[in-house]
UniProtKB/Swiss-Prot annotation:
PROSITE patterns: AA_TRNA_LIGASE_II_ALA. It comes from Campylobacter jejuni subsp. doylei (strain ATCC BAA-1458 / RM4099 / 269.97). The lineage of its organism: Bacteria, Pseudomonadati, Campylobacterota, Epsilonproteobacteria, Campylobacterales. One of its GO terms (biological process) is alanyl-tRNA aminoacylation. The keyword Phosphoprotein does not apply. Its cofactor is Zn(2+). GO terms for cellular component: cytosol. This is Alanine--tRNA ligase.
Length: 842
């Protein structure tokens, strides 16, 4: 049975609009990942945006719980139901139906569609929710309905805001299988399994804790697909269901070991973690040192360590991508499109970690010998800092030994490292925004962007806000303006904001806050709420931005055409004088590839294709072949831009014809993170300036080289440098005088020119037995080097002794060592002491 489809079809038949799963990276700064089905609708529940039409929605939402407040990572593999990635089935009502229908729908689906036995079902309600208790009695005997308090049956989004009682449906897995002391309704055992939570959002909690009834209560429900699939298939663990067993069987085949549930935690960890890795990578998250990318790295490295326990010594996770795509690509079709790119990124990250995992485990095992209860925080930090072991990976390894890590010491060292990094950081552009945008929305609704058609207009000032986003009636200082109709494009989709003027006040920036388009203005003449003002954008700047933005679309198309369909946009920045485009690709681009891409973009520009803009429903746009971006949130109708062969969803401003772009030049190609590359480029006037600068640079090079043929001039210069280096090297050989003691040639000397390492090598090659120590001063920096050949001394000890006299330190091998010093006044003393040490040893 396809439970996912059955659920969505059922609620569609109840007049719910099916909403596609939102991105795992939410449009919510407070969340690391989308971790519940209601997250995409949060701003509707809180009243920040108006209720949708229709007011009923249903979805199967992909979710991640690994990192942040909701973090199940440590438990995955050791329990029957914890996952880093899961799918949440949900139905939602925004001020439409309430408890009676929500309960009736849930009961109908569970008993008539899933056909779960009624005698296995139990219900919980809030202890004060008599309404829900009575409604449930229409479907089930009251002896099967249990009342619990706030801890179990009251839901709230935060300390303030919408909240309400909830009701849960439980499934009895059978007394014959579960009979511990905790296996009762309300206990911590596994016999009674919660399968569906119905939240009745009927109150608003104020800052002082008072609950006030909402005028239009709402419904938010959630049912885990993995859990209900296991129940429907008669399995006691989600991992034994058809969603996971094909992956586990593939792991078993790859490692040539049989999966046994009791000892199979490593199989389960890998099966879970490959699902989350595939989905995160498919949606544009890349392996990184921080943020979401670091959570992804932790997930994969935890799986690799468990693979190591199963005997995998080479990359193997990438081989599991196919089975995940086979299982889930039918519903999430983008997985198949990204499959090759996902494999490459996983393989690259695997090989990177596998090169250090063995050394890291050796260090872990050495420290384990000295550990009684608490593992050293210093060693845990070393494992993290040097060998790439996330703390939770070390903790996971210790868990198997019933030990813990000194997290306090680890965090102390981590904070010290962060402080050092912060000290070298120049600052941040981050700013906390705390304005009453909900009030503005209620008063005025969303204001209108008219900038697609107009560069200037007369418009009413709806609201004025100071720099701290507090509403004011008049404004002379710098602050924010909300116009009824605005020609100013707000920073969005990588495109930078317009600038210009409102009245005589200069507009420096325009941003969107909860779909309100607000412009930031410099201090100047007084503006008043309710008056009409003339708004005018900087049309020349807009035109240059549009040219660069259209070029990113052509670049994206060229990249996919030349490198492959695995390429997808991972970020962009569009300004009036440059563009930056990040994209998924597993390796640096060759000179030939860059030349082909640049040439292809210029061909599309020369083709003079008209820009075609269309508005259509999202699903229709996708069917037409338009490319949508995962990190963008699309609602209702979408704007589709066709530029020649390129077709993408985009809300930005663009040229009317590709010929207006002028010409396109790639300035730089670089890596952003594992699996993500970046191209920086220029078009139009910026391209002309780039070419002009290149030509000026070549002209200056000709003048400096005194040669019109630059390549010939550079070659000649390189030959001269090589000749001078050889002369210097040869001259250094003749500068060293020495004496012989007991058949050993000795040289202790200060030399301020030449390569002292080369001098020492030459000296040692010249004699059968030799000891040499040289001190060199350059730019008041002291360098020492010593060499020993077939003599009873160690170069490391010799150079260390001399360096300490000079206020420095150093060391090295027995035959060669280097050091540094600080005190120039003690060079003679150091030379004298070194000579005495050598003579004594001989």
């Amino acid at each position: 049975m396809d439970i996912r489809k059955a659920y969505l079809d059922f609620f569609a038949s109840k007049r719910h609009e099916i909403t596609p799963s939102s991105p795992l990276v939410p449009d919510d700064a407070t969340l690391l990942f989308t971790n519940a089905g209601m997250v995409p609708f949060k701003s509707i529940f809180t009243g920040e945006i108006p209720r949708p039409n229709p007011p009923r929605k249903t979805s199967c939402q992909t979710c991640i719980r690994a990192g942040g407040k909701h973090n199940d990572l440590d438990n995955v593999g050791y329990t029957a139901r914890h996952h880093t990635f899961f799918e949440m089935l949900g139905n939602f009502s925004f001020g439409d139906y309430f408890k009676e229908q929500a309960i009736a729908y849930a009961w109908e689906f569970v008993t008539e569609v899933l056909k779960l036995p009624k005698d296995r079902l139990y219900i919980t309600v809030h202890e004060n929710d008599d309404e829900a208790f009575n409604l449930w009695q229409k479907h089930i005997q009251k002896e099967r309905i249990y009342k619990f308090g706030d801890k179990d049956n009251f839901w709230q989004m935060g300390d303030t805001g919408p909240c309400g009682p909830c009701s849960e449906i439980f499934y009895d897995q059978g007394q014959e299988h579960f009979n511990s002391s905790e296996d009762y309704m309300g206990g911590d055992g596994d016999r009674f399994l919660e399968i569906w939570n119905l939240v009745f959002m009927q109150y608003e909690r104020s800052a002082n804790g008072v609950l006030s009834p909402l005028p239009k209560p709402s419904i938010d429900t959630g049912m885990g697909l993995e859990r209900v699939t296991a129940i429907k298939e008669g399995k006691f663990s989600n991992f034994d269901s058809s969603l996971f067993m094909p992956i586990i069987n593939e792991i078993s085949k790859l490692c040539n070991k049989t999966y046994v549930y009791e000892s199979g935690a490593s199989f389960r960890v890998i099966a879970d973690h490959i699902r989350s890795s595939v989905f995160l990578l498919a949606q544009g998250v890349s392996f990184d040192k921080e943020g979401r990318g670091y959570v992804l790295r932790r997930i994969l490295r935890r799986a690799l360590r468990h693979g190591y326990l199963l005997g995998f010594k080479q990359a193997f996770m990438y081989k599991l991508v196919d089975i995940v795509c086979d299982l889930m690509g039918g519903h999430y079709t983008y997985l198949n499109e990204k499959k090759d790119s996902i494999k490459e990124q996983i393989r690259f990250e695997e090989e990177r970690f596998l090169s250090t995992i063995e050394n890291g485990i050796e260090i872990f095992n050495e420290e384990l010998k000295n550990t009684k209860e608490i593992f050293s925080g210093e060693v845990a930090f070393k494992l993290y800092d040097t060998y790439g072991f996330p703390l939770d990976l070390t903790a996971d390894m210790l868990r198997e030994k019933n030990l813990k890590v000194d997290e306090e010491k680890f965090e102390l060292l981590m904070n010290e490292q962060k402080a050092r990094a912060k000290a070298s950081w120049k600052g941040s552009g981050d700013k906390t925004v705390s304005g009453d945008f909900k009030n503005l929305l209620e008063k005025f609704g969303e204001n209108h962007f008219v900038g697609y058609e107009k560069a200037e207009c007369e418009s009413k000032i709806l609201a004025l806000l100071d720099e701290d986003f507090k509403e004011v009636s008049t404004l002379k200082d710098a602050g924010w303006v909300m116009l009824e109709n605005t020609p100013f494009y707000a920073t969005s989709g990588g495109q930078s904001a317009d600038s210009g003027f409102i009245a005589k006040r200069e507009v420096l920036d325009t941003q969107k806050f909860f779909n309100l388009n607000l412009s930031f203005i410099k201090a100047g003449e007084e503006l008043k709420v309710g008056t009409i003002a003339h708004a005018r954008i900087d049309a020349e700047k807009r035109e240059q931005i549009a040219r660069h933005h259209s070029a990113t679309h052509l670049l994206h198309h060229a990249l996919r055409e030349i490198l492959g369909s695995h390429v997808s946009q991972a970020g962009s920045l569009v300004e009036s004088n440059k563009l930056r485009f990040d994209f998924t690709h597993h390796k640096a681009l060759s000179k030939e590839e860059l030349e082909s891409i640049e040439k292809r973009v210029n061909e599309m520009i020369i083709n003079s294709s008209e820009a075609i803009l269309e508005n259509m429903p999202l699903e229709e746009a996708k069917k037409s072949g338009a490319i949508a971006l995962f990190n963008e949130k699309y609602q209702g109708n979408v704007r589709v831009l066709t530029l020649g062969e390129s077709k993408e969803l985009c809300g930005g401003t663009h040229v009317k014809n590709t010929a207006q772009i002028g010409s396109f030049y790639i300035v730089k190609e670089s890596g952003v993170s594992a699996g993500v590359r970046r191209i920086e480029a220029v078009v139009s006037k910026a391209a002309l300036e780039f070419v002009k600068n290149q030509l000026e640079g070549l002209s200056k090079a000709k003048d400096e080289l005194k040669n019109n043929d630059i390549l010939s001039g550079v070659k000649k210069l390189k030959n001269e440098i090589l000749s001078l280096k050889n002369e210097l090297k040869n001259s250094s050989k003749t500068e060293l005088d020495s004496k012989n003691i007991q058949g050993v040639e000795i040289c202790v000397k200060r030399v301020d020119n030449g390569d002292i390492k080369a001098m020492i090598d030459d000296f040692k090659n010249k004699f059968a037995k030799a000891v040499i120590l040289l001190i060199q001063v350059k730019d008041e920096k002291i360098t020492l080097a010593a060499g020993v050949k077939d003599a009873p001394l160690k170069a490391g000890a010799l150079v260390k002794e001399a360096a300490q006299i000079l206020g420095g330190n150093g060391g090295g091998r027995d035959d060669f060592a280097t050091a540094g010093g600080k005190d120039l006044s003690k060079i003679d003393e150091a030379l004298k002491q070194s000579l005495e040490t050598i003579e004594k040893a001989l």
